Amino acid sequence: MEKELQIVGFRIGRETFGLPISIVREIVRVPEITSIPNAPDYIEGVINLRGRIIPVVDLRKRFGEVVIKADKRNRIVVVELENRNIGLIVNSA
């Protein structure tokens, strides 16, 4: 019997993507983001999530999508990759 893969789906622009639920730690509304000087343009900065400092990547910029102004539907998907937490800004999750 094949193991079922559960995913969290989200959109970036008009494209839909998915991440294995096993790496998703949480999904939060976009809080205040502190910018990081001299970081690549797709690194929005960092957030303080209950005492944890999480770097935040804007996937629209990373994938060359048109960047639109943030709105209340945007979310940050916090994932764990190689024992590090990273926040991914997405259009909706």
Language model features with spans:
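An acidic, low-aromatic, low-complexity terminal/linker signal
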Residues: 1-93
